[in-house]
Swiss-Prot record:
It comes from the Bacteria. The gene is rpsG. Belongs to the universal ribosomal protein uS7 family. This is Small ribosomal subunit protein uS7. Keywords: Ribonucleoprotein, Ribosomal protein, RNA-binding, rRNA-binding, tRNA-binding. It comes from Pseudomonas fluorescens (strain SBW25).
Length: 156
């Protein structure tokens, strides 16, 4: 156990355009090498593309996509005796959002569209409809937890 105090959680300021804290946090996930202006351009560009294609509030679609990606349970490795078990555990809300954002950005980067804004828009729309690589990742994690349900008594 660390002997130092736990670092205080820093509040993320709301994003300037939509006034959403979760969107500001998402921009930080998109950001590479501290280039926040580039990340903002990518995210706002993606939301504009979503608005063009769906003719509805892009922030609602973004939140719907995050809900579709966020896992409810995951597995953690637990060593008992000489064996390592994959123990299913519930995911706390802050980690749910963090995982959802990470998966969304990772799978958007792997897509084939030309610009990152287009890739992100495509992944957002797919996730909001319950398809796409990020949603598949969530289903895989849930399937893994279901398969290892027998070890759930090895709680942390």
């Amino acid at each position: 156990m660390p002997r130092r105090r736990v670092a205080a959680k820093r509040e993320v300021l709301d994003d300037p355009k939509y006034g959403s804290q979760i969107l500001a946090k998402f921009m930080n996930h998109v950001m590479e090498s501290g280039k926040k202006a580039v990340a903002e351009r990518i995210v706002y560009g993606a939301l504009e593309k979503v608005k063009e294609r769906k003719n509805s509030d892009p922030l609602e679609i973004f939140e719907k996509a995050l809900d579709a990606i966020a896992p409810l349970v995951e597995v953690k490795s637990r060593r008992v005796g000489g064996a390592t078990y994959q123990v299913p555990v519930e995911v706390r809300p802050s980690r749910r959002n963090a995982l959802a954002m990470r998966w969304l950005v990772d799978f958007a980067r792997k897509r084939g569209e030309k610009s990152m804004a287009l890739r992100l828009a495509g992944e957002l729309l797919d996730a909001a409809e319950g398809k796409g690589a990020a949603v598949k990742k969530r289903e895989d994690v849930h399937r893994m937890a279901e398969a290892n349900k027998a070890f759930s008594h090895y709680r942390f």
